[in-house]
């Protein structure tokens, strides 16, 4: 368990030293942490799926829910009725035929 800790510690030190070596000026490394307003807006927009709009749930404009603008493709599909009694009888006949064939050939 200690060896895993030491490996993680060495990895953290090497990662930190390579970051410091990549940015000799301390101000340059901080520039990566700052996001521009354009990228923050773009990130917010990309969270919405295509075909969704925000519907305001309150009159003051605070809060809202996502609502799909597309028509729903979830439709109720009726499954045909299958008569299981007939299928069970056919399965029993098939099992009996297989058992007879195996008995005739001497297989188990």
Curated annotation (Swiss-Prot):
Primary location recorded for the protein, binned into one broad class: secreted
Top-level taxon: Eukaryota
Record's signal peptide: 1-22
Motif range (RxLR-dEER): 45-58
Short motif Calmodulin-binding motif, span: 79-83
Subcellular location: Secreted; Host cell
UniProt KW keywords: Secreted, Signal, Virulence
Protein name, entry field: RxLR effector protein PPTG_18954
Family: Belongs to the RxLR effector family.
Subunit structure: Interacts with the host calmodulin.
GO cellular component, as recorded: extracellular region; host cell
Domain remark text: The RxLR-dEER motif acts to carry the protein into the host cell cytoplasm through binding to cell surface phosphatidylinositol-3-phosphate.
């Amino acid at each position: 368990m200690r060896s895993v800790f030491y490996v993680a510690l060495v990895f953290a030190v090497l990662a930190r030293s390579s970051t410091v070596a990549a940015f000799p000026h301390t101000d340059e490394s901080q520039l990566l942490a700052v996001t521009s307003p354009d990228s923050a807006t773009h990130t917010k927009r990309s969270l919405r799926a295509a075909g969704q709009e925000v519907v305001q749930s309150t009159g003051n404009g605070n809060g809202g829910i996502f609502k799909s603008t597309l028509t729903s493709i979830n439709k109720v599909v009726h499954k045909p009725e299958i008569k299981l009694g007939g299928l069970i009888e056919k399965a029993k006949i098939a099992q009996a035929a297989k058992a007879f064939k195996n008995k005739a050939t001497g297989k188990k």
